[in-house]
From Swiss-Prot:
Full protein name: ATP-dependent Clp protease proteolytic subunit
Family the entry assigns: Belongs to the peptidase S14 family.
Species this protein is from: Burkholderia mallei (strain ATCC 23344)
Pfam families registered for this protein in UniProt: CLP_protease (PF00574)
BP terms from Gene Ontology: protein quality control for misfolded or incompletely synthesized proteins
GO CC field: cytoplasm; endopeptidase Clp complex
MF annotations from Gene Ontology: ATP-dependent peptidase activity; ATPase binding; serine-type endopeptidase activity
PROSITE patterns on file: CLP_PROTEASE_HIS, CLP_PROTEASE_SER
Location in the cell: Cytoplasm
């Protein structure tokens, strides 16, 4: 039992968000680190892509557009992917807002994370040198009666075709190659992702 408390503390500490304190002539003001970076127009998408993640990212994109519709927004991605519908909410908002949305992969951009990475403004898609990118087709787990499984299968096939066409548009690859290359998990280095058209630059230092 004596070792349980340190482990609990470590688990809680991993969820802590650092606080930044800024001092000016008007006194001190504190921000959580993500709010402070939001002031610099940096949005983080970290972890699974789900409805909660999508709501937060979409809200931040819309807020930053209202603040300045002419200044770029940076979306930093470290995600294994997740829900297609949640990812498409982010994707559509990225295309909808007036500012260019620059994307940067740090760590991993897989599945829907890779799709959103490739969906950034042309010429403004980046990855760090040791980042990994993975593309594949949508996953499905159809259950229920035969008619229900048929409906779900049609929807998955539609989503696969839609995602393939969008990925072809953003990478410059033809749809047939995208379909072949996403048939199974397809991992790439940053340089491979650049050659494929998923990103435009491999960043080793901030410009």
């Amino acid at each position: 039992m004596a070792s349980q408390a340190p482990r609990d503390f470590e688990a809680q500490a991993l969820g802590l968000v650092p606080i930044v304190v800024e001092t000016s002539g008007r006194g001190e003001r504190s921000y959580d680190i993500y709010s402070r970076l939001l002031k610099e127009r940096i949005v983080f998408m970290v972890g699974e892509v789900n409805d909660q993640t999508a709501n937060l990212v979409v809200a931040q994109l819309l807020f930053l557009e209202s603040e300045n519709p002419d200044k770029d927004i940076s979306l930093y991605i470290n995600s294994p992917g997740g829900s297609v519908s949640a990812g498409m909410a982010i994707y559509d908002t990225m295309q909808f807002v007036k500012p260019d949305v620059s994307t940067l992969c740090m760590g991993l951009a897989a599945s829907m994370g890779a799709f959103l990475l490739a969906s950034g403004a042309k010429g403004k898609r980046y990855a760090l040198p040791n980042a990994r990118v993975m593309i594949h087709q949508p996953l499905g787990g159809a259950r229920g009666q035969a008619s229900d499984i048929e409906i779900q299968a049609r929807e998955i096939l539609y989503l696969r075709d839609r995602l393939n066409h969008l990925l072809a548009h953003h990478t410059g690859q033809d749809v047939e190659r995208i379909a072949r290359d996403t048939d199974r998990d397809n991992f790439m280095s940053s340089e491979d992702a650049k050659a494929y058209g998923l990103i435009d630059h491999v960043s080793t230092k901030r410009p």
